[in-house]
Every structure is written in C-alpha cells, then in structure tokens.
From Swiss-Prot:
GO terms for cellular component: membrane. Residues 452-478, 562-613 are annotated as: Disordered. Keywords: ATP-binding, Calcium, Calcium transport, Ion transport, Magnesium, Membrane, Nucleotide-binding, Phosphoprotein, Translocase, Transmembrane, Transmembrane helix, Transport. Its EC number is 7.2.2.10. Belongs to the cation transport ATPase (P-type) (TC 3.A.3) family. It comes from Plasmodium falciparum (isolate K1 / Thailand). The keyword Thylakoid does not apply. It catalyses: Ca(2+)(in) + ATP + H2O = Ca(2+)(out) + ADP + phosphate + H(+). The keyword Zinc-finger does not apply. This is Calcium-transporting ATPase. The active site is at D358 (4-aspartylphosphate intermediate). The chain crosses the membrane at residues 64-81, 93-112, 271-291, 301-321, 975-994, 1001-1021, 1043-1067, 1119-1140, 1152-1172, 1186-1206. PANTHER family: CALCIUM-TRANSPORTING ATPASE. ATP binds at K716.
Length: 1228
C-alpha cells in the first residue's frame, strides 16, 4: 500500500484506484468515510505546540549572566535585611537589588514580546491550503470543506483551483493541463501535467519530474481534470515542509553573538568566583575585628564586599547596549531596504561565509522576458536582435555584433568596438573599471569612480542634446583618450555607425499580431499605463510584456506579394491604409524609417512603480479554456471582440488564485483596464476559433477575422514543429518559398538560443478561406496548420536582476562564497549562474565532469537528488573545497541538508528564498533572508531578514552593515570590559589594603548602567572602515576579546583602579581641610576596623557622622567616595574616546569623527553632575557636591589614561605592522 502511494506516478491509474479501493465513477461511499478518517486522519497541517507565557518568561532568565545577577540581587537583599539589627533600614538601602531585578524584568518583557511576534510561519503555511474541494461521493459531485478530504477521494480541478491534497491524475478533459507549482519546486514556468504513468526508472525521481501528480496548494492555470487523492495533511509535500519547519524550530538556533555572550558569561563567572573568594579569604583575619561585633557579622560583611565586587565585575548594561546597537543597525538597514525581524541576525550577517541563494525571484526578476528574437528583414537573411541594457533603459540590437550571453550586457558591444580599435572603453556590468551613474558598487571596483561620476554629471549638465534613448553625452572620436576610464555614451555616433538597432517596421505587423492574438494571457494597467495585474501562463505573459513595455503599436500591414502557387488558393493580405491615431502612437516612442534611433523602454521604472501598485500575478492564465470539451470549439461568438470576451470571462475569476509571487496589497485596483497597447492589437481582429495546444502537435493556433473581413490563421509553438509546417517566409518586401538552407539557418539560430537556456518559440500565419472553417475533427487541424508562412522566432528567460552580478563579485572580494540552489533545470541554472558571476563564462559546461568531483574540481553543478545520494564525507568535501556551486532540481529537503552540512563544517550560512519550498532551509540557516515583494508569507515568517526590494544587492549592503556593527560592538564591549576591570581593580585594591570601600554598590550600578551606557551606545555609531568589504569574514567562533587585547585592557583597568583608590586615600591623608575634615595616617586608614580599640582617637564631625568617631570611616568618607566616583566617571569618558579605534591615535581619528560619542560623553558627565548637586539624588547615591578645586584634582587623576592608551596604541600598531610585513614576506 505504502509503495503504491509513494510511487503512484509509476503505476497505472487503474492500479492506484484498485489499491485505494475506490471506483472513479462513484467515488468513496459515505459509510466508509469514518473508517478512512480513523486510518488517515484529517486533511490539515499540524501546528507545533506553543509555549505558554510562563515558559516564555522562564526562558528569558535561562542565561548565565542573568543568573549571576539574580544571585547577587538575592544575596544583597538578604544582607540588607540582616543589617536591620544594626541600623534603621530605609528604602534606599534596597536600591541595589531593586535596580538589578527591575532591569532583568524589563529585559524579560522585551524578550517575551519579540518571541510572541516572531513565530508565525506555521500559521502562514496553513493559510496556503484551500478551504473547499469538489469531490465525488456516492456518484454525486459536491463541494466540501477540504479538511474532510480523505485518501481515495475523487476530486475535480479546473482553472483557478488550488489542489487541496496530493493527487494522482486520472483523466484530463482539456487538451492540456498546466500547473503553477513554483512556490513548491522553484521552477520559473508553469508545468505541463499528464495522466499517463511514468517508467519504473522514475520511482525515486525528484518531485519536479512527477508529471502525473498534483501537489497540495499548487494552482491549476490551464485545463480541467479529475484526480484521486493519494496523500493528505502532513503526508503531502507541503506537509513535509511543515514538518521540516517544526524540526528547525526545535533546533538550537543560537546566533554567533549569543554563543559569544554565553561564553563570555561563563568565563566571567569563573573569574568573578575566583576574585570574590580571594577577597573574602584575604580579609579572613578581619572577621573578628571589634567594628563588626562578632565573627559571624564580620564574615557576612566581607561576603557583602565580595557581592559588591561581583556587581562591579558584571557589565549590567551590556545586554541593553547590545540591544540598542543592534536596533540602531536595523534602522540603518531599513533605509537600505533590509527589514530585520530578529535583532541578533544583524551581527551574524557580519560573519557570513556562504550565501545559499534561491534563483527564481531572488537572483532573477521572476518575470519571463523576451531577450532575443529574429525576423527575415532581408530577402535571404535571418536577422537576430538581442536585448541590451544601460541603466534603466533597454534596447534591442542586431546580435551579429553581440556575444552569446542570455541578454547582452554592455561588454558585448563595447568590447567589440574596443577589439576593433575604434574606442577605448570598458563599461560592462561586471567588468573592472566600469562606471554607471546609478551603480551602487562602482566605488568597490574603480578608485577613480567618484571622479568619473562627477565628470559624467558635469558632461550631462553641459549637454542638452541627449537622445530619448537615455544617452548621457555624445563624444566625438577626437575627444576619445587612450585609457580604460573613457566614458562612452550609448548615443555616441560611433555606436550608431557600428551597431544596427532594431526599429519597428510595418512589415513586422503579422509577427506582433501573432504574438498578441495567439495568446490567452492578459495584462491590466492603471491610468499611467503601469501594469497592476496580469493573468496567464508566464511564457505567454513574456510575449505581452515584450509588446507592451516597448509600446509596439499596429501601424500598416504591407501588400506582400505572394508566390504564384500560394495565390492560387489564397487572397493576399490587404493593407488597411490607415495610420494609427492613438495618442501613444508609434511615432511618439519610435523613430521613423529615416531615423535610426533605437527602441527604448524603461522596464525597471515600471518595476519600481509596481512595488507601490496592487501587483497580483493571478494564474488564471487560460481561464477562457475552462469547460472546453474539444479542440477548436468556438471560443467566442463570431464577430465579438476578443478583448471584451476575454475580460468578461475573467470577471468572476480574477480573485481565484495567485502564484507564489503574489504580493498582498490592499490598494484598490478597480480602475485597472486591459493594456491599451495590447488592446490595440487585439482590436485589429475578431477571434473566431482557438485550436488549443496538444503534446502531439506542440502548437497552438487561433483563427481571426481582420477588419478587411479576411480570415487569418496565426500559429505559435515549438520551433521544430512550426518550421516543419512552413512552406514560405515573410520578408519586408514579399513572401518567398522557405527552402532547406533557410530552414537550417533558422534551426541553427534556435539551437544557439537553446544553448543559452532560452525557452524558444516560433510564429507563423496563413490566409484561410471560409470553407476552411468547416472543420470537424483533430485531423482537420493538422491539415489546416500546413503550408504556413514563417514570421519569426524568439527566446525568453527569467533574466538576472540589475547589478546582481556586481554584488556577487563583491561577495567574492569579501571572501564570501555564493551558491545557487534552485528547483529549475541544470541548463537554465547554469546559464544564469554564468551571467551573474557565480560561475565563470567558460566553466561548468561538461556535465560529466560536474558529477565526478575530485580534489581538483573547482566549479561544479549538481542535481539535488544526486548530491543527496553522495556520502556525507563526499558532501562535506565538495562543500568545503568548491568555491562556486550550482545546485539544480533541488527539493526542500535538499536545501535544508546543504545548509546543515555547511553549518557542520563551521560555515556561517545565509539562505535566501521566496517560496514555500525555501522555508525549512530559511529556518535552519544562521541567517534566513526572504523576499518582501514577491515572497510568500511562509518564507517571510521563517526568515530573520526580509528584503523590501527583493534584490540580492541589498544582501551585500546588509552584510556590510553587519560587519560594521560587529566592529562597533567590539569597540563598546572593549570599553565596557576595561571599565569593569577598573571597578574590580578598585575593589580588589581596597580589600588588599584593608581600607574602607571607596565605591558603594549603588554607585557601581549607576556607572555600569547609566554613565557608561551612553558612550557605549554612541560607539555603535562609529562609521565603517573604508576596507570593510575587502576583508575576509571572521570565523563565528572568534572571541570578542583575545589574550593580547585582554592584557591591554587589564593595564588600563589597573590604572583605573589605582586612580580611584589613590584619590580616596589622598582625601584622608593629604587633602586640604576645606571641608574641616581631620587628616589621618595610612596605618589608621588601613586598620580602621580596630578603631573602637583606639581610646584617644578623635576627629572632626563632618557630614552625617554620628557621635561615634569611628563613623568617620563610614558616614564621614562620603566626600572621599564622591571624589573616587568622579574620577571613575571621568576616566570612563576619556576611555570612551580611546575606544574610537583599536590601533589609531586620537590625533589620527579625532573624537568629532563620531559626534554622537562626543554628545554622549557630555551627556554622561551632565548626569553625573545632576546626582552631585540635586540633594535627593545625592542622598540616594551617597555623594556630595564638589568644588572647582575638587574637579581640578579629579581631572589630574583622570587624564593620564589618555596618555597611557596612546602609548599602548603606538606599540600595538607597530606590532601589527610587523605581523603584516612578516605575512607578506611569507606570501612572497
């Protein structure tokens, strides 16, 4: 049973029905439904059990640093309660534990809120499932909730329906059945489905090859069929994806930053424990001092000192500062179209070593585009035109001057000119020295790019003769200089002389009539002619986009002279002799016959506008075929406009279903109308019959009546079939016989397109008589489609996004490998990969070499299923040692496995995708990146980052920002650690000397959370280094602080401790008695615990001293403590300035390079002043106001930290240069 269901595609339908015990004519019986429900369950996706709010809260405290702080707060609270026997307790005595607990509660609240809003991917998956299904039960068709669909149910599906479960096709009632399953498989085009069984050799094939299986949640775009359900719920392919997402949720998903912070917490806890125990043991001899009253209280007192030491050592503000820094980074990334859903992912981007990118919709536009076409412009010569791009403008040039790329970048013709010695230029989209005014990456590839851009702008300002084509400046030949930085505009006279531009001709009339009218797709525009809706098969839509975007409108039809033998049975097509009166007529956008300006279209401008429009790509591509029972049935009433019929038939279907790149938008598109350009072509004729596509003919034809009442047959289809049926061909002068030589020339052109992974189509037409309409069976259609006139052919592909090639080159410069993982076929994947620099132009062609990977293999293309069959060791070897890889025909499980192996190898993996099939891999990767416009909700919710512009280039900007954030994070962590080392050193020295503690725990909390917090946050605004994207990515296990850096900050921290203790001691021993306090000697200060045994010890009563003179060492020390705290704060401000750079002096990088830091240091000092001079605050923090002389002393003790750090930087920088010099010598 399991075997039959698993491999239902290799069994006859009758065998499948027999195993499922169901009759295809009656369906399941109602009495057996309960048994099937018990056996197979309901047709719904499981949802992972959600954590309770209590579990979420507990998870926020499952952190070592947090646990240490909780323990410190608890002990502090207990010790404060124990002090009740000695003194009156006030609320301010509990300030330390209260502040710690409050901070932890706030952090937990933020964490719970983020987690509650993050996990929605499973709910999004459930929303993909259709809610209703048409099912046959007890011989009757009925509509039921798809939840109650069971294995063995017979279902009916037609255009616009979503498949409610995995099903085996029983019978197709239309001539063809096409399914849009790109959201599941990643294929860029809709897929033909058949009912016939497949060979046994396909038992373990990938899901893309299962041509007789319909998968749950995929959409029917053409045809009608019945099928039997073979899998429901979690057993379906989309159920497997859900299971993978659940598994990914349960995996350890700690980011590198979280791992580092946890490791830091472990190391810190060990250090704190050692220091606390050491301090406690050092003071063991003082436990019985009279001041404590008893040994127990002495023990508790020094235990409290140890707790204070722990508070000083823990950077309480670190979590808040890290969160703030990441949040600020996300704001900057939003401006660059990267929306961050999980804060920690920002830092992880900085250490990305491998980007695994989906192809369709990520690296490419996810819009099939016509990139090359050919016509017989001359009598015996086939002319091919190829798409070229400059900036936002597209052109078609004669391809005899171009290379055989998918579509010609600028290298194709500029390098051609350069090779001929006519011009020195280099303006390819992916070549060194290239320059483009809008190019975001030119700074990385040319040191003179900024100067060149300025020169270009100046040239533009001085020239008012730019052509409509977007040319920037016409540069005469005599102005050319012999250097690689010469800028050549496309409007240059040199180009006009060298390149033949395509210009629409009236002789191409029938070619475009065939493109538009032999086509069941449609596009709808708003009032500005911007596409807002499109319906139909992606291939047919590419033909309409070609006509619409280049605004090709009907003008004349030519009186072509036909061969005599052809004229015997037909009447020549007559010219309408009418010029187009449309306000968007041909002369507005294209040149006349005397003007050789090239056709232009700002396709990308439309793309930009589509982001703001309600852009829904509905897949009711062939809605007009719904319900057709036979080939050639009258599609529309004779004499009725094709456009009106098409629009009215689609009226109640436009919201039926959508493709995987549907963009949910609430904008109202009720004013959208069919494209004026497309309508103008369809209004040229009235459609009589459609002869639908069949696998045997591989053709589709349409019979129309033009305005002259002539009956014309237009055909499109597979080039080999069209060419075989053609007897003539159309030129600009006449109609000529098509001989074998010309047929071979056409075949060669088509084969060249195929080598470039283009999907090819050819077009033909012929004149019919009224008797030809009396057709009754399929054989009549074969006869009708003979003796055709060849019009031309074209190639389409989903082209790469603008600048994606440069973005990938920049990744390579930054030491990041880019892998393509796609569900598409190997030829298309390889062609795109070469175009965008994932593969080199001349590599990866030999498929046999690709699959026999050895140690020397550097470039590889792999089929997903074959890669899965490799041993784990071989998979690791390939992924570790191969710099460029393309994976094709991959399934969701393959993508997840690739990501898992890469992570096991220690790589930091970023995964991009837009479809449902990408969700498991997005979840598993260190960074999941989804497309925001065309991405499914499933992909978005499974991701960490969403790209608002669907552009791979944005990923590079995000990585740059991630690296900058990490560098800044290192700066403020170093700053905070050195500060905490200073505090620890202060307490340790105090305990070692046996003097009163100079800093109270609440003062340390103030410094750690507030005073240090502002400068630390401001360090997150440090601008990026100029070479941040020219460095290799760091390893995710690299420590934030290495041994040398720690030694460096121990030196600084030791000075901080010495300075804070020294000014404290200075006040007792040497400070002028401006406040009337009594100077004492060092012995008295270091043995203050024995004060009660000194019979004649007398001091002046200052501040809040009691009658007990020994209180001089507790309440009387408030001024000394204030001086100590002020020195600590000012040193920290100087230390923040030192943290601007790890190696560069303040003379090289002045503080005003980061004005946020300057303002933050001033703000921190103002806050410190507030607690000194506002009495209520001064009482809480145990401080008093300082005089001008006091501040002078504070400055004298603080400023040397600048000098000390400058000395350390000098030696550290010199050592760094020596290391670099040594490495260079070794490399040389």
């Amino acid at each position: 049973m399991e075997e039959v269901i698993k491999n239902a595609h290799t069994y006859d339908v009758e065998d499948v029905l027999k195993f499922l015990d169901v009759n295809k004519d009656n369906g399941l019986k109602n009495e057996e439904l309960d048994d099937r429900r018990l056996k197979y369950g309901l047709n719904e996706l499981e949802v992972e059990k959600k954590k309770s709010i209590f579990e979420l809260i507990l998870n926020q405290f499952d952190d070592l640093l947090v646990k240490i702080l909780l323990l410190a707060a608890f002990i502090s609270f207990v010790l404060t309660l124990l002090d009740m026997k000695h003194k009156k307790i006030e609320i301010c005595d509990f300030i330390e534990p209260l502040v710690i607990v409050l901070i932890l509660i706030l952090n937990a609240a933020v964490g719970v809120w983020q987690e509650c809003n993050a996990e929605k991917s499973l709910e999004a998956l459930k929303e993909l499932q259709p809610t209703k299904a048409k099912v046959l039960r007890d011989g009757k068709w009925e509509i039921i909730d798809s939840k109650y669909l069971y294995v063995g149910d017979i279902i009916e599906l037609s255009v616009g329906n979503k498949t409610p479960a995995d099903a085996r096709i029983i019978k197709i009632y239309s001539t063809s059945l096409k399914v849009e399953q790109s959201m599941l498989t990643g294929e860029s085009c809709s897929v033909d489905k058949y009912a016939e069984k497949m060979e046994d050799s396909y038992k373990n094939c990938e899901i893309q090859l299962k041509k007789n299986i319909l998968f749950s949640s995929t959409a029917i775009v053409c045809g009608r069929c019945i099928a039997v359900v073979i899998n429901i719920g979690m057993k379906t392919e989309i159920g497997h994806i859900q299971h993978a997402v659940i598994e990914s949720n349960s995996e350890d998903t700690q980011t590198p930053l979280q791992i580092k912070i946890d490791l830091f917490g472990q190391q810190l806890s060990k250090i704190i424990f050692v220091i606390c125990v050491t301090v406690w043991i050092i003071n063991f001899k003082h436990f019985s001092d009279p001041i404590h009253g008893s040994f127990l209280y002495g023990c508790l007192y020094y235990f409290k000192i140890s707790v204070a030491l722990a508070v000083a050592a823990i950077p309480e503000g670190l979590p808040a500062v890290i969160t703030t820094c990441l949040a600020l980074g996300t704001r900057r990334m939003v401006k660059k179209n990267a929306i961050v859903r999980k804060l920690q992912s920002v830092e992880t981007l900085g250490c990305t070593t491998v980007i695994c990118s989906d192809k369709t919709g990520t690296l490419t536009t996810n819009q099939m585009t016509t990139t090359v076409f050919h016509l017989f412009r001359e009598s015996d010569s086939l002319t091919e035109y190829q798409l070229c791009q400059k900036g936002d403008t597209y052109y078609f040039y004669e391809s005899s001057n171009l290379t055989n790329d998918i579509y010609a970048g600028e290298s194709s013709f500029f390098n051609k000119l350069k090779d001929e010695g006519n011009v020195e230029a280099l303006t390819d989209d992916g070549e060194e020295g290239s320059i483009d005014e809008a190019d975001p990456y030119s700074d990385y590839f040319s040191s003179d790019s900024k100067k060149m851009k300025n020169d270009l702008n100046n040239n533009n300002n001085n020239n008012n003769n730019s052509s409509r084509s977007g040319a920037k400046r016409n540069i005469p030949l005599k102005e050319m200089k012999s250097n690689e930085n010469t800028i050549i505009s496309r409007g240059s006279k040199i180009l006009e002389d060298k390149i033949n531009k395509y210009c629409y001709s009236e002789y191409d009339y029938n070619f475009y009539m065939c493109l538009v009218n032999c086509n069941e797709a449609n596009i709808f525009c708003n009032d500005n002619s911007q596409i807002v809706k499109k319906f139909g098969d992606s291939t047919e839509l590419a033909l309409l986009h070609f006509v619409h975007n280049f605004d090709i409108l009907p003008t004349f039809s030519k009186n072509n002279k036909m061969p005599a033998e052809y004229e015997k049975n037909t009447t020549p097509v007559q010219s309408s002799n009418k010029k187009d009166k449309s306000p968007r007529g041909i002369n507005k956008f294209f040149s006349s016959k005397n003007d050789n300006s090239h056709i232009t279209s700002t396709l990308n401008e439309n793309d930009k506008n589509l982001k703001n429009a309600n852009h829904s790509n509905y897949t009711t591509a062939q809605a007009t075929t719904n319900g057709y029972e036979a080939i050639g049935e009258n599609t529309f009433e004779h004499g009725t406009s094709f456009e009106n019929c098409f629009h009215s038939k689609l009226g109640n279907k436009i919201n039926t279903t959508s493709t995987h790149n549907n963009n949910n938008n609430n904008n109202n598109n009720s004013n959208s109308v069919p494209s004026e350009c497309i309508s103008s072509w369809r209004n040229e004729c009235k459609q009589i019959k459609i002869i639908e596509f069949t696998r045997e003919r591989k053709l589709m034809s349409v019979i129309v009546e033009n305005k002259k009442k002539e009956i014309i047959l237009y055909c499109k289809g597979a080039p080999e079939n069209i060419i075989k049926n053609c007897k003539y061909y159309l030129t600009k002068n006449d109609i000529r016989p098509l001989n074998e030589t010309l047929k071979n020339e056409i075949h060669n052109k088509i084969q060249n397109m195929g080598k470039r992974a283009l999907r090819t189509l050819s077009f033909a037409y012929k004149k019919l008589s009224s008797k030809d309409l009396n057709i009754k069976n399929t054989d009549d259609y074969y006869k009708l489609e003979q003796d055709l006139i060849y019009l031309g052919g074209l190639g389409i592909i989903d082209p790469p996004r603008k600048y994606v090639g440069r973005a990938i080159r920049l990744c390579h410069m930054a030491g990041i490998r880019v892998f393509m993982i796609t569900g598409d076929n190997i030829n298309t994947a390889r062609a795109i990969a070469k175009e965008i620099n994932i593969l080199n132009k001349n590599e990866g062609d030999d498929e046999k070499d690709n699959y026999t990977n050895n140690k020397n293999t550097q470039i590889c293309c792999y089929n997903g299923r074959e890669f899965e069959d490799f041993s784990l060791e071989k998979q690791k070897h390939i992924l570790k040692n191969t710099p460029r890889i393309v994976f094709c025909r991959t399934e969701p499980k393959h993508k997840k496995q690739i990501v898992k192996v890469l992570k096991d190898l220690g790589e930091t993996v970023a995964m991009t995708g837009d479809g449902v099939n990408d969700a498991p891999a997005l979840k598993s990767a260190d960074i999941g990146i989804a497309m925001g416009i065309n991405g499914t909700e499933v992909a978005k919710e499974a991701s960490d980052i969403v790209l608002a512009d669907d552009n791979f280039n944005t990923i590079v900007e995000a990585i740059k920002e991630g690296r900058c954030i990490y560098n800044n994070m290192k700066a403020f962590i170093r700053y905070l650690i050195s500060s905490n080392i200073g505090e620890v050193a202060s307490i340790f020295i105090t305990a070692l000397l046996g003097i009163p503690d100079s800093l109270a725990p609440v003062q340390l909390l103030w410094v750690n959370l507030v005073t240090d917090g502002l400068p630390a946050t401001a360090l997150g605004f440090n601008p990026p280094e100029h070479d941040v994207m020219k460095c290799k990515p760091r390893h995710k296990n690299d420590n934030l602080i290495n041994g040398l850096t720690l030694l460096r900050y121990i030196i600084i921290g030791t000075y901080v401790g010495i300075a804070t203790v020294s000014i404290f001691v200075y006040w007792f021993l040497f400070y002028p008695d401006s406040d009337m306090h009594t100077l004492i000697n060092f012995y008295q200060l270091s043995h203050y615990n024995q004060c009660k045994a000194w019979n004649n010890f007398r001091v002046n009563k200052v501040y809040d001293m009691s009658e007990d003179h020994c209180s001089y060492f507790s309440a009387g020390k408030i001024k000394a403590s204030t001086l100590s705290l002020s020195v600590l704060v000012l040193i920290e401000m100087f230390n923040a300035l030192n943290a601007l750079s790890e190696y560069n002096s303040l003379f090289e990088i002045p503080p005003w390079r980061n004005m946020y830091l300057v303002l933050a240091t001033i703000g921190s000092l103002l806050l410190h002043v507030l607690i000194l001079y506002i009495p209520p605050l001064a009482r809480i923090f145990g401080v008093v106001p300082l005089s001008a002389y006091d501040w002078f002393l504070v400055f004298l003790w603080s400023f040397p930290v600048i000098i000390l750090d400058e000395i350390i930087k000098f030696y550290a920088k010199r050592k760094l240069k020596e290391e670099q010099r040594t490495k260079k010598i070794k490399i040389d």
